């Protein structure tokens, strides 16, 4: 198991909380909570050791524009592919944007 942390610039705080995915399904889960301070912080707990560069590249693409909400994201990963990670992130961000 490996724990990774990342931080990116962000805009206004997320409007709500969100949960996407289920780690028990051999996939991953994304937990998102609003945060103050104009920063998006991400913590990844993964079963794949040495995967830090892959996560960094994925997040750099997803959060390249400073339009991401200020939030704290926790990801519990069980070897999900980058496509699934992006899908779950987008689902959580969309859910957090609803009232």
Curated annotation (Swiss-Prot):
Subcellular localization: Cytoplasm
Secretion signal span: none
InterPro entries tied to this protein: Mal_deCO2ase/Cit_lyase_ACP (IPR023439), Malonate_deCO2ase_dsu (IPR009662)
Pfam families: ACP
Post-translational modification, as annotated: Covalently binds the prosthetic group of malonate decarboxylase.
Residues bearing PTM O-(phosphoribosyl dephospho-coenzyme A)serine: 25
GO molecular function ontology, one term from the record: acyl carrier activity
GO cellular component: cytoplasm
Keywords linked to the UniProt accession: Cytoplasm, Phosphoprotein
Family: Belongs to the MdcC family.
Protein role: Subunit of malonate decarboxylase, it is an acyl carrier protein to which acetyl and malonyl thioester residues are bound via a 2'-(5''-phosphoribosyl)-3'-dephospho-CoA prosthetic group and turn over during the catalytic mechanism.
Name used for this protein in its record: Malonate decarboxylase acyl carrier protein
Source organism of this protein record: Pseudomonas aeruginosa (strain LESB58)
Lineage: Bacteria, Pseudomonadati, Pseudomonadota, Gammaproteobacteria, Pseudomonadales
